[in-house]
Structures are given as structure tokens and as C-alpha cells.
Amino acid sequence: MADAASQPIYWSELGLSPGIDLGFFTLRFYSLAYIVGIVLAYWHLGKMIKAPGAPMAQSHADDLFFYCTLGVIFGGRIGYVLFYRPDLLGTLDMFKVWEGGMSFHGGVIGVVLAILFVSWRGKLNWLRVCDYIAVNVPFGMFLGRMANFVNGELYGRPTDVSWAMIFPTDPDQVARHPSQLYQAGLEGLLMMAVMLLLFWQTRARWRPGVLVGVFTIGIAGARFVNEFFRAPDAHLADVVRDTGLSQGQWLSIPMILVGLAVVVYALTRKTKGTPEKPASA
């Protein structure tokens, strides 16, 4: 009985498919995750700006929807090439987004640049706009990590835990942490709960920077923890061996520090017109 209980779970036996065959083309779940995540974020942002104190109008939300989508795609890809695959620089392969390879940290930079542009053009308080966008990012984070799991990619390090899995794309075919699910839980569900609670049930949105600061600390902290379970990219194994931390962890440390600085600034800065009670949902 003990031997049977310790047998790893075979991903291939879960009946998962990386896409939906529509006949004329296959809709991959990773693409679907991006689409659904963006639509959910857009819908919820529309609900948020109808509540008292919103820093933007619907027209600004429409602009953010467009430019942040571009920021995620281009920032994520450029960040991946710069941080993880500099060997692709100067080649056509650096533009092949459909072959996979997106950087979380690059996507964050792309979104921040998009927010700065829209805020500058619309004369908006960019820090408050960041707050509103940050609340909605976990929708996409959760769906994206679940898509990674459905694709059987970005699996974790070898382990003997009872829920360990063997993924078909693993050349070593050893039991590993399903780290995609850990990330979906921490970066997605947990951060979703924290950000929605802070926005709808507290006065955090009336203090510019609190929400985006908490989000930055939480998402980077979750990534830092998850990296202990996630298998490092083969071409970056030397970073882990030489420093004890992965590339993702080194990139997360400055994000945590920036998030802390933003929260401290937001809480110590005097605000005007803060209401007695937060608006209800």
C-alpha cells in the first residue's frame, strides 16, 4: 500500500490537451488564458471606475486595455530575450512569440511603461492608475499559470512528495513539483483575494500607491518563494549553482524593495479628501 501511495502522478494520464481543435485551427489554452485574463481585467476595471474616487474615465480604461496588452506581449518577450535568452538577440527567433518564452518581469516593465504613457497623455495621476491596474493583474496570472500546467511546461524540481508528477516534456522523466499550480495559487488566487479585499473593503484606494505597492511586494515575494520549487532554465543553471538563487529570484528582489518603498511613501504622504468609509462594491 505504501508503494502504491508513493507512486507519482503521470501528467499524460490526466487527459489534458494544450488546445481546442476547432477544425481549421487549434486554439491553444495559453492564448485563451491571455484573452480571458484581459477580458476579465477590462470588465472588472470598468466596475472599479464606476465607484467613487476613480482616477480615470471609461475612455482612459479603453486606452489602458489596448496599451497594457501591447506592454504585456512586447515587454514579456523582450524581457525574456534580455534576461533569459540573450543569445537570441539580433536573430529572427527573438520575434517568434508563438514558440513560447515570455518573462514575467519584462511584462511588468511593459505594463508600467504603458500606464506612464496613457497617464501622461490623459493628464492622469499615474500612481493611482497603477493602483487600479494592479488589482486586476492576478486574473491573468492565475489563468496563465493554469495554462502552463495544461501545457505540461515550466514544471518544478525533482521531489518525492505524494502529489509529484511526471511531465511528458521532461527529458529526465522524473517526479517533479507541479510548480505551475503553486504559482497559480500564490500569484493568482492569493493575490486576487488580497487585492480585491483591499480595494473593495478598505480605504487603500484613497492612498495613491498602496495597492500597487502591496501588489509588487506580494507578486515578487510569491515568485521568489515559487522559484525554490520551479526547475531553473537549463541555460541558467549556473546562476543557481554559483549564487544559490535563480535568475527569477534575483529579478524579484529589487521588485520587493521597490514595492516596500512605494508603500512607505503612500502611507506617510498626506492625502486630501479621504472619506470616512470606503465605497461598497
From Swiss-Prot:
State which Enzyme Commission number(s) the record gives. Answer: 2.5.1.145
Biological processes per GO annotation: lipoprotein biosynthetic process
> What keywords sit in the KW lines?
Cell inner membrane, Cell membrane, Membrane, Transferase, Transmembrane, Transmembrane helix
UniProt key word Transferase: yes
**Functional pathway:** Protein modification; lipoprotein biosynthesis (diacylglyceryl transfer)
Question: For binding a 1,2-diacyl-sn-glycero-3-phospho-(1'-sn-glycerol), which residues are annotated in this chain's numbering?
Answer: R145
Q: Name one Pfam family in it.
A: LGT
Subcellular location field: Cell inner membrane
Listed under GO cellular component are: plasma membrane
Residues spanning the membrane: 29-49, 64-84, 100-120, 124-144, 180-200, 209-229, 248-268
Membrane topology term reads: Multi-pass membrane protein
Q: Does the keyword Isomerase apply?
A: no
Q: What is its main location?
A: membrane
HAMAP family (UniProt xref) = Lgt (MF_01147)
Q: What does this protein do?
A: Catalyzes the transfer of the diacylglyceryl group from phosphatidylglycerol to the sulfhydryl group of the N-terminal cysteine of a prolipoprotein, the first step in the formation of mature lipoproteins.
The name on file for this protein is Phosphatidylglycerol--prolipoprotein diacylglyceryl transferase
